Amino acid sequence: EATDHYIRSNLGMRHFAIKATEDEMHQDKNKCYQNWSTPLETERIIELLLNVRLFDDEYQGFIKTTMMSCETGKDRLARPLQGNKAIIGHKTGTGDRNDKGQIIGMNDVGFVYLPDGQSYTIAVFIKDSEESEAATARIIADI
């Protein structure tokens, strides 16, 4: 509740909900659907992280550095950037499978600095995938 309230009150975000903890979602997979956001709203948060002082510099820098050293999901957003000098900071997420055998959610959210000086933010969410984890990750990379 505190995180949901902070994001709504202090960041002005409306198109999301944080209702369940990770433990609660692992215990009851239906609770995964209570936590949601739109890709655009998530990109807005990344833009704020990059361009607005949200926290003390130490903490905000830690978040950015952690995203740039992300070891998971190299087969997602990072895959098409491998081999060039782009810098990517991202955070991945992979949900459990629901009772139908679908991956409840797989995502990758982040920012990219291209060698030519251009930059962008990106958020790709896949819900209820019937594909394998590898195939779902390829879909994210292909976007």
Residue ranges of each PLM-predicted region?
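Structured C-terminal helix/loop/strand segments within mature extracytoplasmic catalytic/sensor domains
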Residues: R44-I87, T92-I143
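Mid-domain, small-residue-enriched loop/turn segments at the edges of structured enzyme/sensor domains
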Residues: E1-L54
